[in-house]
Amino acid sequence: MSVGTVSRVVNGHPSVTEAKKRIVNEVIAELGFQPDVAAQSLRRGTNRTLGVVIPDLRNPFFADLMQHIELRAKERGYSVLFASSDEQVDSEADLIASLARSKVEGVVVVPSNRASSLANPEGVRLVVVDRRIAGHPFVAADHRAGARMAAEYLVSLGHRRIACISGPENAFVARERLAGFMDVMAPRLAEAGLDPASWIVSAPFNYEGGREAAKVLLADDGPKPTAIFACSDQQAIGVLRVAFDRRIAIPGELSVVGFDGILVSDLVVPRVTTAVQPVASIARCATDLLIGGEALDASASHIFPCAMALRETCAPPR
């Protein structure tokens, strides 16, 4: 077996067959071999480290994403540096440049909601997650199809007065999810003589955003929705809190669907029905793209389908 084949196995290259991997790994275990990380870094001009820049450390979805990126990176023999831009475009650019100067092999970036481009003066390899930025490969869930699926599920239960808590208007994922909701609901609301715009409230993706939007949608005056599609699980949990405070039974009087599939959505009572993003697949794909070595342009993008997790917050309307 050639030195090159052994090197590819040690460095986690995907081109080696499973049979050869097994033989090399058995010999490595028998000899107690440990690769010289310093020598590898010197040869490659990098330090087998990846960077990750996210916009908000408080968002549970991003925490989950970081965990899965780190797991995949470790499987490939890499460590990870994490940083948060706090939704600041200037900070985002500074962090990417700083990570590049640290000789990371690439950076996974979840851009801030206001970002329309990514500054990359150091020329580091970039993969964008969860948003779409022109000229860069992106890895994301199919937000629009996931929202359509959520709205169609509520319609299948018999709901017609379905409201939507959208996200910030400048957020790519908010626009995509709202578009998916409107694909299903715009004609149905119009048929019912309801103005679609009056059944949509934009709010931050967090718990408080969901609470404040729910207060508007569940106000005492005018017709009320029998169901609410919240464009994030955090918003959906905020709706549950308002319903609890107002003694609105869920799902008896109001059905609620979220989006993301964060852990806490399966822990609250009642457990939230939600459109689940395949975060492990997204993280794995983004990490492998960075490490893979192929050209990184928009053609390398990947979109993953969402799946509905049917739990305890939905029922047919009374």
Where in the sequence are the language-model features?
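N-terminal helix-turn-helix DNA-binding module of bacterial transcription factors
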Residues: M1-R48, R318
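Short beta-strand segments enriched in small/hydrophobic residues
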Residues: V3-R8, R43-D56, Y153, R161-P168
